[in-house]
């Protein structure tokens, strides 16, 4: 077994300068490894085979599920000693309605910013704080 969150080292030959072409290659051989190519293919497969509902909410939710299939989880892909690649945020935008949706690594709840609730003719920059603290809905 050679699976690891660390980048693999060339153990083939000292005379051949083999280098990893992508982060996450310590998982090569593991079904669904974390290399860029594998993640791209998995994202394409998931997008092309997923089923979405007909509402805006269902489509947005499905989008985040699709990208969740390829997100980077802290600890699985080491980029430097003690530092790991993570999916910092995921976002999509409904250009017809002017709504920007996002989640962050630390807050999985989907946040929406409706651009049409702002004065789009204003010369002032409008900014919102990124909601990056886990937001758990307490049901009872």
Language-model segments: which ranges?
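C-terminus-biased signal that marks the final domain/tail of proteins
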Residues: 1-140
């Amino acid at each position: 077994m050679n699976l690891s969150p660390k980048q693999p080292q060339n153990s083939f030959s000292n005379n051949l300068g083999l280098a990893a072409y992508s982060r996450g290659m310590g998982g090569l051989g593991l079904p669904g490894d974390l290399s860029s190519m594998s993640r791209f293919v998995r994202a394409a497969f998931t997008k092309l085979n997923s089923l979405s509902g007909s509402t805006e909410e269902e489509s947005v939710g499905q989008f985040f599920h699709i990208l969740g299939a390829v997100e980077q989880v802290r600890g699985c892909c080491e980029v430097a000693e003690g530092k790991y690649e993570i999916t910092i945020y995921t976002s999509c935008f409904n250009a017809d309605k002017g709504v920007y949706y996002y989640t962050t690594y630390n807050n999985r709840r989907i946040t929406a910013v409706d651009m049409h609730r702002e004065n789009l003719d204003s010369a002032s920059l409008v900014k919102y704080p990124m909601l990056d603290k886990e937001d758990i809905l307490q049901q009872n």
